[in-house]
Amino acid sequence: MQLEDMVAAIEASGQYRILRRLNTDCSQLRPRDLFIEPGLIGTKLGGLLDCETTGTDPRTSEIIELAIVPFSYDGDGNILAIHQPYHRLREPSHPIPEAITQLTGIDDAMVAGQVIDLDELEAFIRPIELCTAHKASFDRKFAEGLSPAFASIAWACSVTQVPWREEGFESRALGYLSLKSGFYFDGHRATDDGVATVEILGRRLPRSGRTALSFLLEAAAQVTARVRAPNTPYERKDLLKARGYRWSDGSDGSPKAWWIDVPENRLNEELAFLKAEIYHRECNIPIRMITARDRFSVRAD
């Protein structure tokens, strides 16, 4: 009995689920049965960016590994093909913390003398229409710190802009999403994480039947308003929390205030809520309109 026949027999029993290892060797990648056949009309180029860094603060930490996995897609959110990725290591100005080495497997010896050629990088990303990351609020800030060319690209986030919970997923972690999608991979290396994320975006979600990418494209196209509520009465914080506001303590350089992002068509409703339920008066409330060109960047903070 062939291996695939054995797998089919085990799965048919209804007692087991099989996890397949995802091939992340992009030199062997081609349009797979998972995706529809590539076409030319309406095809766009996206890029899945992932970086490994020396820490979590883009003001003090540095990129040590950068990967961008390009993929072709259509306007309906179907992924047509995955293309050869960009991948580079980079030596930081300080030794890599041991905790980062344990997490990623990247040590000082691996990155010694390694640099990222910005001309090469910027030429690679020039055709990309939408840059996606699994937690874009992290990756975009690091990417723009490396090259200002990333600021001119529209960005999307596969963590926050896909309705994972509504589709039956209990976590948005990449490892969990891959296991629920029926495969596993070697995580915490930039290219592997990138290929795995593209794989997940191309699959149809269990409840809606739509691809994850279709939700991502829809969310990225929206104009949203970031509404800030500074100097609110302490006793009304629970009202803000219940409505979905988050607290910024200013430690990341953003204003110290409660804030929420709402669709443009809900802005007036949100302002009315703040004036009636929080401030109990007419007031000027700070608002910033945000598109995919600025979303997840320091400019949106």
Question: Where are the language model's segments positioned?
Answer:
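Acidic two-metal-ion nuclease catalytic site recognized across multiple nuclease folds
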Residues: 1-37, 203-301
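Conserved non-catalytic scaffold segment of RNase H-like nuclease domains
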Residues: 2-153, 171-187, 277, 281-284, ...
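Short linear loop/turn motifs
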Residues: 114-119, 189-196, 250-261
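Acidic, Mg2+-coordinating catalytic module of metal-dependent nucleases/exonucleases
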Residues: 128-146, 164-231
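Conserved beta-strand -> loop -> alpha-helix junction used to position metal-binding or nucleic-acid-contacting
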Residues: 151-164
